[in-house]
Structures are given as structure tokens and as C-alpha cells.
Amino acid sequence: MRRNFCSEVLPTKNPTISSSAFVADNATVRGDVTLGERSSVFFGAVLRGDRAPITIGSGTNIQDNCVVHVDYDYPVVVGQNVTVGHGAILHGCTVGDNTLIGMGAIVLNGAQVGSNCLIGAGALVPQHAVIPDGSLAFGSPARVRSALDEAAIAELRQSALDYQQEAMECKAEQEK
């Protein structure tokens, strides 16, 4: 007899979503997921907290078609004012505040990406890798290439603020 994954494995815990967060109509947020104030989950993204919790910090945006998933003993913790670019995958990892994960990047179990970091588009941050605060990292496997200067860090902050504004516009439209 075939087992039903959704009824046997997925938790009965419901997501905790801030009233100021935006979740697109066709995004999936399921299980032990917490979305902070002014956070956003854009179109087609999937956040599935079935084996461990997912915590998305205030002001963080999870863009179109991202996948955020966990593994046993590997929760996902994403800090505040983080931008997770289109199609990125976060799996059982930690991402610090004010960081940008580029489009199509993959961050694997146990990886730790610091605050004020830029992970380049298409990068692969391997299992248990550590990217220090203030780093530019890219490639497959991702390697730290340089430290970010204050201007680059300010751009990371602005990206998060821009997406907070866009999310609030989408939320208002969706609630009409």
C-alpha cells in the first residue's frame, strides 16, 4: 500500500504569518513557518516547514519561484531585510541580516551565510560552508571573492526596502 506523504509526513502545525506580511495567492507556505513583519513571499514560491521550522525575518523578501525547505535537524533561519532572488533555493541553512541571495543560487544544509553578504546569481553554497559577514561570494562551489564596501552594503539595504514597498503594493491589490 502506498503511503500518503502529505498526510503522514507534513506537520499539522500551521504557519504563523504577520498581518503586515504579503504572501502571493499562488505561493505555498506550509507547516512550521514563521513570517516576520513586512516580509513577503512572491509568486510561485514554496516554503515548506515539514521536518524543521522555517523562520523568515522582518522585511525579508522571498522572490518568485524560490524554494525554502528544511531537513531533519536543519531548520532555515533567514534574518531581517534579506533579499532572496528569483528561483533561489534555501535548504536547511542560516542567512544573516541584510544579505542578498542572488537569482538561482542554492544554499545547502548547515551552510551559514553571514550578515551584509552578497551571494552571486547561480552560486552553490555547499553543505556546512561558512560565508563570513560582509562577503561577496560566488561560483560553484561558492567562494569568498572580496569584502563588500559600505556602498555595496547600502545597496543591499535598499534592495530590501524596495521589495518591502513592492510587497505592500501587491498586498493592497490582492486584498481588493
Stretches found by the model and what they are:
Residues 2-16, 50, 56-58, 64-66, ...:
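Glycine-rich hexapeptide-repeat left-handed beta-helix
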Residues 4-41:
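N-terminal segments that cap or nucleate solenoid repeat domains
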